[in-house]
Swiss-Prot record:
Native organism taxonomy: Bacteria, Pseudomonadati, Pseudomonadota, Betaproteobacteria, Neisseriales
Intracellular or extracellular location(s): Cell inner membrane
PANTHER family documented for this protein: MEMBRANE FUSION SUBUNIT OF EMRAB-TOLC MULTIDRUG EFFLUX PUMP, MULTIDRUG EXPORT PROTEIN EMRA-RELATED
Induction: Expression is positively regulated by MtrR. MtrR acts by modulating the expression of the regulatory protein FarR, which directly controls the expression of the farAB operon.
Protein name listed in UniProt: Fatty acid resistance protein FarA
Region described as Disordered: spans on this chain: 1-23, 356-376
Chief localization: membrane
Gene Ontology process terms (BP): transmembrane transport
TM spans (from-to): 33-53
Similarity remark: Belongs to the membrane fusion protein (MFP) (TC 8.A.1) family.
Gene coding for it: farA
Length: 394
């Protein structure tokens, strides 16, 4: 009985040993496979870093920036109307606020009347000049008659038909006529001098002065309307109706949201291979990773962020600790991307720059054009001047 039981036990022991060996073999194979997979993954990661990732610089310290165009009046006054509020979209030239214009309207009407008077005065001076010219012609005719009378009497005096007294009277008449001609010529010269010479009505000094006053009054009246200096969205409105404002005081701001960029603050160690013109990809926290903006490096700041702070760092001390500095890098965005997915100033962005692309260390092209104030259109007041000059024509 004992020998019969021992044989099954030996067989079971052999089976257990076989299973254990198989398990150990499988475990070694798994470890080998895992080790090989890890090595391949590390090699792939190293290759990817060498081929792609080492040519990318990324930062999350980036924010949307743009121009905040201040709206200020060009003259002081009391605010009568405020036509736009925060978040309103406006176009360049739109009226944003209106100042009280009662005094300016009166000044404008007074200037128009002064121009009318200047034109009429010029007409009177023209008439006086014409009258002085007629007097010169009349006096010259009197002189010619006196000279003819003197010649006749002189011829008769030789035969004794005319007395010496009559001949003396004739000579006196000629002298008086000559003096009258000289006086008339002087009066004509004075009238022409007062007229300003042979120039057109518009070019007369008095008329030019009156036109200048009229344009000045019209400009002051026009400046009671505070207009938008650029296309954009109204922000930071602080002006209220009835408020007394001075020239240059900020009333509100206009932000051109179509012209925004990103200021990305890269570490100084990340700028080694970064150049102007290199492409960039940007992601906004507002829209998430599914929306990618295209852009390019436009320029580097002239100094680090701390260099332009109100209180620059003072490193000339014994307990100095080196801190990696960050340099603001401007990234311009593709206009089409911004139009499809508008951004707001101050939004957070994640920026990746492809440093393997070609670029220039220094910008050789001028930057984007800055907003300009709307130039004054003088056509309206010029038409008014033309109407006044035409109505005053003889």
């Amino acid at each position: 009985m004992k020998s019969g039981n021992s044989e099954p036990n030996l067989m079971e022991t052999h089976t257990d040993e076989t299973k254990l060996q198989n398990t150990q073999v499988k475990r070694k194979r798994r470890l080998t496979a895992l080790t090989l997979l890890f090595a391949l993954s590390a090699a792939a990661a190293g290759s990817a870093f060498f081929l792609w990732w080492q040519h990318e610089e990324e930062t999350e310290d980036a924010y949307v920036a743009g121009r905040v165009v201040q709206v200020t009046p060009q003259k002081g006054g009391t605010v009568r109307k405020v036509l736009h509020d925060d978040t309103d979209a406006v176009k360049k030239g739109d009226v944003l606020a209106v100042l009280d214009d009662d005094n300016d309207v009166l000044a404008y009407e007074r200037a128009k009347n002064e121009l009318v008077q200047a034109v009429r005065q010029n007409r009177r001076q023209n008439a006086a000049t014409s009258q002085a010219g007629a007097q010169v012609a009349l006096r010259r005719a009197d002189l010619a008659r006196a000279q003819d009378d003197l010649r006749r009497r002189s011829a008769l005096a030789e035969s004794g038909a005319v007395s010496a007294e009559e001949l003396a009277h004739a000579r006196t008449a000629v002298s008086q006529a000559q003096a009258a001609v000289k006086a008339a010529l002087a009066e004509e010269s004075s009238a022409r001098a007062a007229l300003g010479g042979d120039v057109s009505l518009r070019e007369q000094p008095e008329v030019q002065t009156a036109i200048g006053r009229l344009k000045d009054a019209w400009l002051n009246l026009r400046r009671t309307q505070v207009r938008a200096p650029a296309d954009g969205q109204v922000a930071k409105r602080s002006v209220q109706v009835g408020q007394q404002v001075a020239a240059g005081a900020p009333l509100m701001a206009v932000v051109p949201l179509s012209d925004v960029w990103v200021d990305a603050n890269f570490k100084e160690t990340q700028l080694r291979h970064m150049k102007i013109g290199q492409p960039a990809e940007l992601v906004s926290d507002l829209y998430g990773k599914q929306i990618v903006y295209r852009g390019r490096v436009a320029g580097f700041s002239a100094g680090t962020g701390s260099a332009f702070s109100l209180i620059p760092a003072q490193n000339a001390t014994g307990n100095w600790i080196k801190v990696v500095q960050r340099v603001p890098v401007r990234i311009v965005l593709n206009r089409e991307d911004v139009d499809r997915h508008p951004l707001r100033i101050g939004l957070s962005m994640t920026v990746k720059v492809d440093t393997s692309a070609a670029g220039a260390p220094v910008s050789k092209t001028p930057g984007a054009a800055l907003p300009e104030m709307e130039s004054t259109d003088w056509s309206e007041v010029d038409r008014t001047v033309d109407e006044i000059l035409g109505q005053s024509a003889p």
